[in-house]
């Protein structure tokens, strides 16, 4: 797969990044290099490799679920300029 100048401009537009005409060719080269590397990764045979979520084995510690309020409401809103019943008060922005 190859990225052309029009695709670079479209990606920049979607990412809301201003890209000058002089910046398009270097970005095009970089994106093509990245895609070439990804294609190389796709060619690697991983049929005998077991999927994993971490490089190091980890056992998840489980605990009993307990519903609580956390006990931190007052600490959380302590520095807020306006609060009511441990909730933040903010100015109305939509009528």
From Swiss-Prot:
One of its GO terms (molecular function) is ATP binding. Its EC number is 6.3.5.-. It holds the Pfam family GatC. InterPro entries: Asp/Glu-ADT_sf_sub_c (IPR036113), GatC (IPR003837). The keyword RNA-binding does not apply. NCBIfam families: gatC. Belongs to the GatC family. Allows the formation of correctly charged Asn-tRNA(Asn) or Gln-tRNA(Gln) through the transamidation of misacylated Asp-tRNA(Asn) or Glu-tRNA(Gln) in organisms which lack either or both of asparaginyl-tRNA or glutaminyl-tRNA synthetases. The reaction takes place in the presence of glutamine and ATP through an activated phospho-Asp-tRNA(Asn) or phospho-Glu-tRNA(Gln). This is Aspartyl/glutamyl-tRNA(Asn/Gln) amidotransferase subunit C. It comes from Methylobacterium nodulans (strain LMG 21967 / CNCM I-2342 / ORS 2060).
